[in-house]
């Protein structure tokens, strides 16, 4: 029983470590992409490209009216909220947004990931040792 508890604690610790490391990597990639966009010269779309985009937008709007999920296989943004469901996507995007961190604010993402890992870790330890 004790070996299973140690294994579970090791898994939780590795997940927490991975999530913190991946958070830093995502922030670095976002920064590089923003820099590349800033350095790239702006190119105005041609009339042909605008027509193609208009056709795609029209098809997506028609699919949305018919109830199809769209090209990516996922519901369009905000569609669940429009149908009266809880805005989970908005909730989690706001919870794990790194915009505040990038601007020097409080690291909310790291805070919540650490809090989540701590709660799971404490639950596993209390279950292993019979603490209620």
Curated annotation (Swiss-Prot):
TM annotation in the entry: 111-131
Motif RxLR-dEER per record, residues: 37-83
Localization, UniProt: Secreted; Host endoplasmic reticulum membrane
Keywords for the protein's UniProt record, in alphabetical order: Glycoprotein, Host endoplasmic reticulum, Host membrane, Membrane, Secreted, Signal, Transmembrane, Transmembrane helix
Topology within the bilayer: Single-pass type I membrane protein
Glycosylation: residue positions: 25
GO cellular component: extracellular region; host cell endoplasmic reticulum membrane; membrane
Record's function text: Secreted effector that inhibits stress-induced relocalization of the transcription factor NAC069 to the nucleus, thus affecting its broad role in abiotic and biotic stress responses.
Similarity field: Belongs to the RxLR effector family.
Subunit structure: Interacts with host transcription factor NAC069.
Name this protein carries in UniProt: Secreted RxLR effector protein BLR08
Gene: BLR09
